[in-house]
């Protein structure tokens, strides 16, 4: 009897995910976390890139009153693993994005592959890559925000921890806040698992109401790290102006 082998490439691992369940979770609760996709050695290799020169810009969060920590945007070309994950995550998320647009009575504007979407970004003057590494030490945090860099924006994005909560750092939970019209804000506090991708809205998502779907505004941030070093990889699909 033939034996099945585990997917070896990042793209194969992403393709093998239970996308039916993940899409349902995104539709119902607005976020979903995959099982681990990146292996421990891959996470360590990405984290080690933080101190090299492959970045187009560095942001000190305190200086800009974004929180306490540091992040760096990768330069082009992206590291192979980051580029592979970005391209593999995009198609199933584009299906979700188009479904959300239809629920809100809009056209389904997102092409099926990332290259076509990036061409749209570039035509709008958004040519700088946006995947990034983020690092926090004890006391580090990130205030609530949205990752928008121009008129063209993809409705979903992804983040993964590159080290282990409870072992390499404490605190630092991912915080996702939704503001529904004429209602109090609701916070989702999520523990990131190393190598697993949390999928979540960039700016808004549809929620079903008594008169059809309506928009709820989303923002995200990071709770205070109480000990250790927390590192994450963020994958944003639209480029920046």
Please report, for each region that a protein language model flagged, where it lies by residue:
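A structural signal for short, well-ordered beta-strand segments
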Residues: 131-133, 158-160, 233-237
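A short glycine-rich, His/Asp/Glu-containing loop-to-beta-strand
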Residues: 32, 126-138
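Histidine-centered catalytic micro-motifs
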Residues: 142-149
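Catalytic core of Fe(II)/2-oxoglutarate
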Residues: 154, 165, 169-241
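Fe(II)/2-oxoglutarate
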Residues: 1-28
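Short, conserved beta-strand element in jelly-roll/cupin
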Residues: 135-137, 151-168
């Amino acid at each position: 009897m033939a034996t099945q082998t585990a997917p070896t490439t990042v793209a194969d691992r992403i393709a093998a995910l239970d996308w039916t369940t993940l899409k349902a979770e995104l539709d119902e609760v607005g976020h979903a976390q995959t099982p681990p996709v990146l292996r421990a050695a891959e996470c360590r290799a990405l984290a080690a890139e933080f101190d090299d020169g492959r970045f187009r810009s560095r942001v000190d969060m305190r200086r800009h009153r974004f929180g306490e920590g540091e992040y760096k945007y990768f330069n082009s070309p992206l590291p192979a693993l980051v580029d592979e994950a970005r391209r593999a995550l995009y198609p199933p998320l584009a299906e979700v994005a188009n479904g959300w647009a239809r629920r809100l009575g809009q056209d389904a504007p997102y092409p099926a592959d990332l290259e076509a979407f990036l061409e749209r970004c570039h035509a709008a003057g958004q040519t700088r890559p946006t995947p990034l590494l983020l690092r926090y030490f004890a006391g580090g945090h990130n205030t609530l925000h949205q990752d928008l860099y121009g008129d063209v924006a993809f409705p979903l994005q992804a983040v993964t921890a590159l080290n282990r909560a409870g072992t390499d750092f404490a605190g630092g939970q991912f915080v996702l806040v939704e503001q529904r019209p004429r209602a109090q804000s609701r916070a989702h506090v999520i523990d990131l698992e190393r190598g697993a991708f949390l999928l979540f809205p960039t700016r808004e998502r549809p929620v079903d109401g008594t008169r059809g779907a309506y928009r709820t505004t989303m923002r995200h941030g990071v709770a205070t790290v109480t000990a250790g070093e927390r590192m994450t990889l963020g994958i944003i699909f639209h480029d920046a102006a």
